[in-house]
C-alpha cells in the first residue's frame, strides 16, 4: 500500500500561476490578437511568449486588465464538450486535438483546451505582476509572477527601495530622482577629477619632452586616465610610451 500527500503550498502556487497565465494570455489574445506560442513555469518566474510585439503602454494595460479580472473573482469552469459542441466553440489550442477534450473557461477572459490544474475562481490568483517584456522573435517574451510570489517580489522591491530611501534621505516615492541627482553629481566630480589629472599629465609630458621611448608606472589611475596620460606624453617624448597602473598582487592596468 502506498500513500501520497499533496504538497499543498507548492500545488497552490503552481495553480495560481497556471490560472494567471491563462488570464494574461486570454486577455492579450482578445485585445491585441496575440497567440501564446510558448510557456515555461519556472521556480522563480514564469514566461509567456506572445506572437505580437507589445508596447510598454499595452503591457501596463494588460497587467491592469488581468488584475481587474482577478479581483472580480470570476468562477473558473471546466467542461468536456461533445464533438458537436466543440465544432461551434471558439477556444485557444496550440495543436489539433482528438478524443475527449477538456476545456477550461475563464468567462470573459479566456477559453482554452487544457489538462492542467487550476484554482476554482480568479480571485484565488490574488495578484499578477508582469516583471519584464522583451522582444522575442517576431513577438515578445513576458516574465510574470502571481499570488504569493508576486507579494514576495513586491516585498523585496519595497525593502530595497526603503534602504535606498534611507541612504539618500529621500522619500520612498522619490528615490529615482535622488539617484539621478547622485549620478549627475558623480559625473560632475569625475569631470573635475579629469581636469585636474589633465593638468598633472601636461606637466609630466613637459618633464619627459624629447625623452624618447618611455615606460611609466603611475599609482591609482583608471584605464581612461592611463589612456589620457599616454596621449599627453606621446605628444612630447618623441618616441613610444607605455603607461601602467596597479601592483603585483592585484594586477596591472595599461
Where are these regions (language model features)?
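Terminal appendage regions of diverse proteins
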Residues: 125, 131-254
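Well-ordered mid-protein domain cores that form the structural environment of catalytic cofactors
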Residues: 5, 23-30
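Generic alpha-helical secondary structure
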Residues: 17-21, 25, 59, 63, ...
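Functional cores that coordinate and move charged inorganic groups
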Residues: 10, 29-136
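Divalent metal-coordination and catalytic microenvironments
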Residues: 22-24, 48, 116, 142, ...
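Short pre-active-site segment immediately N-terminal to the catalytic Zn-binding motif
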Residues: 8-18
